[in-house]
């Protein structure tokens, strides 16, 4: 039988609350895949230890945020933007951009990419989605993940991603998945029935919608038209 000190060390090692070791029987813990969206290359139930820990921390923090809102009498902000693949990625991206309230003028005024990351993160949180960052998970496993629990869904971004631009893209990509889940277009990894090929269609949709949300095609074309390309000496056209 372990001593109190040894039990404390066990709790620290397994990243579990100290009181769990004094329960009459082990608690029933639902599979992590019952909360997060399907991820390419990640099989539900056989996640890496690093990723499992990151997910548990995300879920604990989300639950704490919900409890604090309830105990303090605050209204839990609700993300209500449902997306449907039949609408097309361009329309979904434009709708998300409207909900977040980010304008081209604001983007042009941001000092650098790190300010852009902070502004996008703040906009997503104000829309009713928690945003966390998790360390120690290799980028090859995942750059981002979303927890499809409502109200107050959550997005996790891999802090190993050194580029703020890449973090922004991952953030909006996960937001698209949350919107698709609200629209009943996808569900948690444990219950997602589609084949790998079918799922890649969902991923491509999310990629295109996220790109449109960050930089609308119309705005990009307008910016490109304003660029004057100098003729080189070899240009005889």
Identify the residue ranges that each predicted region occupies.
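Short juxta-domain linker segments that transition from a proline/glycine-rich
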Residues: 1-237
